[in-house]
Structure formats: structure tokens, C-alpha cells
Amino acid sequence: MTKKVYVKTFGCQMNEYDSDKMVDVLGAAEGLVKTDTPEDADVILFNTCSVREKAQEKVFSDLGRVRELKEANPNLIIGVGGCVASQEGASIVARAPYVDLVFGPQTLHRLPQMIDKRRESGRAQVDISFPEIEKFDHLPPARVDGPSAFVSIMEGCSKYCSYCVVPYTRGEEVSRPLDDVLTEIAGLADQGVREVTLLGQNVNAYRAGLTLGSTEIADFAQLIEYVADIPGIERIRYTTSHPKEFTQRLIDTYAKVPKLVSHLHLPVQHGSDRILMAMKRGYTVLEYKSVIRKLRAIRPDLSLSTDLIVGFPGETEEDFDKMMTLVHEMKYDTSFSFIYSPRPGTPAANLHDDTPREVKLRRLQHLQATIEENVQRISDSMVGKIERILVERPARKDPNELAGRTENNRVVNFPAPVASHARLIGQMVDVKIVKAYPHSLRGELVLVHDEAPATTH
């Protein structure tokens, strides 16, 4: 009987990518197939996030829920990976003795060996080392089911923002060799992928030799240009970038590479220079706005999303007002906004924080309401327009409809005959937007672009 693996993913798109690789590794080595129900699984993995305390505690809550499955089936393997694993290490096993594996983001390729050792020794296996970029040399070829795919181009972060745990859990910035990245993307294109999202904690820090042993270095702008030349790739996205390293070369790429979408996620974190300095972000509000101004001079239709932290230690009402001023000025398409969560081991965790939680909550609610108003305003402005979308899949709520995304990352659902679904998935189509909902759009099919073959499923 075929054995199965269940993976629950917390956090960022890097973790989503890593979770897919866990399935690929175990599929290639052990013949496991993915299941969406933990009750059916022979291996249960939690790919964790430690950016906020709430996400970290959710992991232990979920571990408690699968404990009964372990008691009913002692052969069940339970593993904890990701950033919580890197941070907590063997203490996870001390807190939850039924956990069999603890592994970091850089050691997921060792999962088959860790499972074997666990079965042989009867002891929990912990491997949270940082073996540079080794994991990419041991991963099987990427497998995809759809026209969009994530591709990790680098690991780690070297910025050491005062509030952030990522450099401690994922290590310093290490870029994948250029030819490795391009080979993976070319392989994905051969499988019908039309859109790639280049992933990293700080993608615009990418630096890699043009060829093995080469002294000539390719930066992130060059990488994008090379990706755009790969046959079959029609759209390029990336996340996440850092304002400090948003170079003029990268800005110029928006003029040179039409396949680079007019959507950018550029975390600002705050709108007060005083708070940005305390966060050790390395730029001012004016410098951030300068980047956006230059980009919008090239792409007036640029859609912008960001990350914002409310209630950082010492944040005053004046600081928050400056954040709101920036939000209004930038006209963000969306944002990921949260109340500051102190992370153990980071410098900011030692800062005095005397702002009452109810004040932080009020500020967050005001911020999010303002962003939502802007999101709806942008969506409403799209009604009546023709948008080119990449058809990705059947719509989740209605199997008679298809779904895809616009350049500015809006999900569009539109009716299409079921008999046409296989042909349309993976195609670029023009859709007229007829209605705007809070988190999606509804459209009508206008034109199918036949410049590339449909994906095979």
C-alpha cells in the first residue's frame, strides 16, 4: 500500500516552497505521496514559522492534536521543520517527546536519512545545522501541477533588523549558483510553467557567479533578464525585497523586461524615521519613497504591497500618524500588518515597551481598515477594464468557473465551459472585469492568447 505524507505549512512563501520540496524528497526516496488529511498519513510534518509568537505557539497546539494519532499508530513519524525547529532544536522533543524529527530549513533534504536513523535507533533525530546551500544539490527535479511555480534563489538574511529572528533561524545570505536557478526554471517551463516567483528573504541581495568558478558576478537584475529569456516563461514575480538594496539597475529592469510584472511587495515596516532607526532597517522614509517614485515613473500602473509593524517599542501617536501618512501617500494595494511580537534573542526584545496593548490594537485596526478601503477602491477601479490573466486552476467555489491572477495579483474568477478548462489552464487570456468583491474579482472571457501551448495535466 502506498505510504503518505502530510505537511502543514506556517508562514511565508519560502516555507511553501520548502514544504513542496519535503514532499518531493520523500516521494523520490521513500515513494511517499502527499495527503491532505493527517489521519491518512504515515509521516506528518510541520513546517514552522517563528516570526511571531502566535505562529510559534500554534505549532505546539497542532502537535498536541496529532499526539493521539501517534498513540494509535506508534509507527507514525512526526517531524517539526522550519524556523521554530532552528530556534528551539532539541527542546521541541523535550516539550513534545512524541516528536521523531527536528530539522531546519537547510537540512530538509536529509529527511529520508533522518527517518531511517529514527527507525533504526528508536531515538528522535535533530539536525538544525546550516550547511550553506547544500540542500539544493540533493533535491530531486522539481515537479509541478499548474502554470505557476515558486523558485528559491537564495537562503538566509544578513540584515539583522533589531526585531527579526530570521538571520538566526535561516542563517546568513547565501545565493544559489546562477546556472542552478536557470536550470530549475527551464525544467519547470518544460512542464508547462508560465509564471515563476523568485523567492528569498532578501532577493535583491542575490549575487552569484555567472558560471562555475567564474569571477564575473550576476546580480538580481541580471538574473531576472536571464529568466525572461527562458522559452515559455511569460511572467516573473519575486518576493521579498529590501528597500536598502533596491539598486538603480533593478529599477531599470522594469523598463527593460516586460515580463517582470507591475506588482511589487516592498516591506517598509514603518513610516517614522525614528522607529526605522530603532528597527535597524538601514533607510529613511524619504529613501523608500524615492525608490517608489522612480519605479512609478517607469511603470505608472505599479501595484504596491508592503509589511507594517504596529506598536514597536517606543512608538508614539506621532510615529503612528507618520505611518498613516505614508500609507495614504503610497496607496498600497494590500499589506501584511501585525502588532509587534518580541522574539527571544533579538535586540528589540530588550527594549522598554510602555504602550498599552489596547492602544496597539486600536492603531492596528485603524491601519487595516484604511488599507482595506484602498484595496476596495483599487478593485472597484478595475471594473469595466480588460485585464490579462494567467489561468491557473478551476475556481474553488464553482467548478464551472476558472481562476487566474492579474498582474497586480488580484484573483479573477470567470465562467468557462468545462470542456474548455484543460485547454485554457496555463494560457494567458483577456478578461473583462464585471464585479469587484472584497478579495477577488469576477470577469468575463474576452480573448485567449495562443502564443504558447497549454499545460498538460
From Swiss-Prot:
CDD domains membership: Radical_SAM
| Cofactor remark from the record | Binds 2 [4Fe-4S] clusters. One cluster is coordinated with 3 cysteines and an exchangeable S-adenosyl-L-methionine.
Q: Which family does it belong to?
A: Belongs to the methylthiotransferase family. MiaB subfamily.
Report which superkingdom the organism of origin falls in: Bacteria
Q: Which PANTHER family match?
A: CDK5 REGULATORY SUBUNIT-ASSOCIATED PROTEIN 1, MITOCHONDRIAL TRNA METHYLTHIOTRANSFERASE CDK5RAP1
Q: Which gene encodes it?
A: miaB
Q: Does the keyword tRNA processing apply?
A: yes
Name the residues that bind [4Fe-4S] cluster 2: C157, C161, C164
Q: What are the EC numbers? A: 2.8.4.3
Which enzyme type, at the first EC level? transferase
| Domain TRAM residues, every copy | 380-447
What cellular component terms from Gene Ontology apply here?
cytosol
Summarizing the function annotation, the protein's role is:
Catalyzes the methylthiolation of N6-(dimethylallyl)adenosine (i(6)A), leading to the formation of 2-methylthio-N6-(dimethylallyl)adenosine (ms(2)i(6)A) at position 37 in tRNAs that read codons beginning with uridine.
Q: Which UniProt keywords apply?
A: 4Fe-4S, Cytoplasm, Iron, Iron-sulfur, Metal-binding, S-adenosyl-L-methionine, Transferase, tRNA processing
Record text on subunit structure and interactions: Monomer.
What InterPro entries does the annotation carry? Elp3/MiaA/NifB-like_rSAM, Methylthiotransferase, Methylthiotransferase_CS, Methylthiotransferase_N, Methylthiotransferase_N_sf, MiaB_methiolase, rSAM, rSAM_horseshoe
Q: Which residues form the MTTase N-terminal domain?
A: 3-120
Q: Where found?
A: Cytoplasm
State the protein's name: tRNA-2-methylthio-N(6)-dimethylallyladenosine synthase
Reactions it catalyzes: N(6)-dimethylallyladenosine(37) in tRNA + (sulfur carrier)-SH + AH2 + 2 S-adenosyl-L-methionine = 2-methylsulfanyl-N(6)-dimethylallyladenosine(37) in tRNA + (sulfur carrier)-H + 5'-deoxyadenosine + L-methionine + A + S-adenosyl-L-homocysteine + 2 H(+)
Q: Return any one Pfam family short name.
A: UPF0004
In alphabetical order, the GO MF annotations are: 4 iron, 4 sulfur cluster binding; metal ion binding; N6-isopentenyladenosine methylthiotransferase activity
Q: Which metal ions or organic cofactors does this protein require, according to UniProt?
A: [4Fe-4S] cluster
Sequence positions that bind [4Fe-4S] cluster 1:
C12, C49, C83
Q: Which residues form the Radical SAM core domain?
A: 143-377
